[in-house]
Amino acid sequence: TFTIDTVDDVYAEGDEVFRVSVSGIVDSDSNPIFEALNLDNAFVDTTISDETDPGPEDTVTVTMTGPANVVEGDTTTDYTVTLSDPAPVGSIVTLAYSYTTASGDDITETTQAIIGADGVTATFTIDTVDDVYAEGDEVFRVSVSGIVDGDSNPIFEALDVSNAFVDTTISDETDPGPEDTVTVTMTGPANVVEGDTTTDYTVTLSDPAPVGSIVTLAYSYTTASGDDITETTQAIIGADGVTATFTIDTVDDVYAEGDEVFRVSVSGIVDGDSNPIFEALDVSNAFVDTTISDETDPGPEDTVTVTMTGPANVVEGDITTEYTVTLSDPAPVGSIVTLAYSYTTASGDDITETTQAIIGVDGVTATFTIDTVDDVYAEGDEVFRVSVSGIVDGDSNPIFEALNLDNAFVDTTI
């Protein structure tokens, strides 16, 4: 009788069969004992099976080293997988990925590496994707999921892969290039009537942003000012990810301003916490100049009411007490109130006409007096009317769109 010791190795070999057979019967000097032997049934085939539950002695330890960092758009330096026991040359290391702040869109996953001539190492690299998004540092993990042959059969009975992974951080470039830049354009109305809401402005991105991203808007003014519109400060990226629309309300004021131009432009694309969505923006064409025009036919809301108070009487040769012109809406300080005169029993020879008054620091009042002429004629009571004919600037341009002058006069008796 005899026994045979089997070798407990690490390889997943399946059932393995060997035959042990009698080759002779000899003495201690190797001389045959018998003249002849019938050995037809002097053998046994025995099958060696792997353990059902592999132990530590059946386990291959796998480790991985590799880069902690990579710049977006670059290929990583080498990752190296190392085995504690050799595998056949050409065996396949299968790789798996998990993501924390990164995603599968940020890299091109390398799915396998090949065991080299030494039988214990495999190297590979990973390509990162250079996108346009300002994502900050993004972390992914690459790990070993198995060691297999070309038919996907395991090479080893058991693997310890507790240290067979590397976490790598992808960082945005310090200086984004053209490939990292999103082009932003804007279209919108060239004109709007004062008091109306504009038609739509549309912001368009060359690359999609998350739905709900915020387009921040900025304004500059040439002949218009911030008082002429209600600034829309942001627009929201819609379901298509590349467009946002908005309108702007104009203010219907009383001023005769002529055509007024403002510019609305894109200042950024951000998330709800004001973090940039993209690494870089080209906003050179992300603006629209819009001209605000006064209404052709001003309405009551565009009309300034002007009133005048003053002396009912003056003695010939005296200077009147003050006349006061009052506006319902302010005019710029220094604006000119133009005055007109008409006569009933008096005439232009009876007074020295004051032709204008100046709006004071309060913006709504102007005062003036009128000199009467002391002549030799016994004329009795003479009546003249002074009235407001306009409110203008230093170049005689109207300040307001329309005036209500129904009560902008005083009749004075000399």
Positions of predicted regions on the chain:
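Short boundary segments that mark the start of a structured unit
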Residues: 1-414
